[in-house]
Amino acid sequence: NAILNYIHETGNADFVNGKMIFLQGSPEMKEKNGIKIGRLSGISAHYVPNYLQKNRLPSWETNCLEDWDTKVNRIVEETVQENMTVIAGIPSWVQMYFEKLNAKTHLKIGDLFKNFQLFIYGGVNYEPYRAKFENLIGRRIDSIELFPASEGFFAYQNSQKEKGMILLLNSGIFYEFVKADEFFVEKPQRITLKDVEVGINYVMI
């Protein structure tokens, strides 16, 4: 939905014709007591929309590598000559990928991948990484922030014109909140979405 919303807002869908990479943990699943388990970022690999699958990198074999340094080196080899248009992942992982590309080619990422248009990230606060990424990329590109967690997919950035993310209300998630300034009291009052007020900071439970 985040990517479709971006296409709707900007009118830009050219990136779907290029190569895309989602830096993530191994997508291999294990079974324990009859339940399939795996890394959250790896599980998400099984739910990439069909219209993005055909141009997706890296290869399955590379994606399943456990050693992260070996994996990123292999990803660099698989992508350095490709027409990369979308790059996604946790900022610290993507930073490592970009730095290895830069070390290999001595090029800014925006010069190496001339059609690189969209950076998708989540998992951590991006602000500490922003200056480093701007330097590594060397030019402005659009970005989409996501709010994924093991408990559910909560929100995504729905505008290139404003900061912030829109909370997903139709994903089978029941939300509860506590006012941020009451979070550390012994019995804070929990409220549901209908009682949330604009302009007040909340902790999502």
Task: Show where each model-derived region lies.
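Conserved adenylate-forming
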Residues: 1-36
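Active-site glycine/GP-rich loop and adjacent strand/helix microenvironment
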Residues: 19, 32-205
